[in-house]
């Protein structure tokens, strides 16, 4: 069972079909995550921004089996995610496309997965007939920007860890 820590609005922004009312979109998003959690039995924590219109204090909810955290007024979800990966002994899989948060999580010993890759897992689990070999078909999936020593086909240690964690989701 994995502990998944999600940057809520970051992941919602990458998903298709979530235009319009913010609260209705958030409910549909949480319903999709709940279906995923039911299938995979992972512990999921979603952190939402309250920076511009939140409460005076940080609030926590438990809905549909998902732990939801709303940051307090003036605080970003990024700050809560950084605090959680720093303070907790649990190994998190952090889902975000925010490079700063991802690099902070990885430097703290956690795994960071881009939102786009997790979205594929989220939809694939609800549609098992989807093609599982998308990485083999995508010619740009494995790109290397620096010349490496050793086996040129072997992914970096961080990339192998990220791939292993993504495959386990």
Regions found by a protein language model. Name each.
Residues 2-5, 10-169:
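Nuclease catalytic cores that cleave nucleic-acid phosphodiester bonds
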């Amino acid at each position: 069972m994995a502990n998944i820590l999600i940057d809520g609005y970051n992941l919602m922004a990458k998903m298709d079909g979530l235009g319009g009312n913010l609260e209705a979109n958030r409910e549909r998003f949480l319903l999709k995550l709940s279906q995923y959690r039911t299938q995979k039995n992972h512990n999921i924590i979603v952190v939402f921004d309250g920076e511009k219109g939140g409460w005076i204090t940080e609030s926590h909810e438990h809905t549909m089996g998902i732990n939801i955290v709303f940051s307090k007024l003036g605080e970003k979800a990024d700050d809560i995610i950084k605090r959680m990966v720093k303070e907790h002994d649990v190994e998190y899989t952090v889902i975000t496309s925010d490079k700063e948060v991802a690099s902070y999580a990885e430097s703290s010993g956690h795994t960071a997965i881009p939102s786009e890759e997790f979205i594929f897992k989220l939809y694939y689990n609800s549609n098992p007939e989807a093609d599982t070999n998308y990485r083999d078909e995508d010619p740009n999936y494995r790109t290397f920007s620096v010349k490496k020593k050793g086996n040129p086909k072997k992914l970096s240690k961080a990339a192998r860890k990220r791939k292993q964690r993504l495959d386990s989701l």
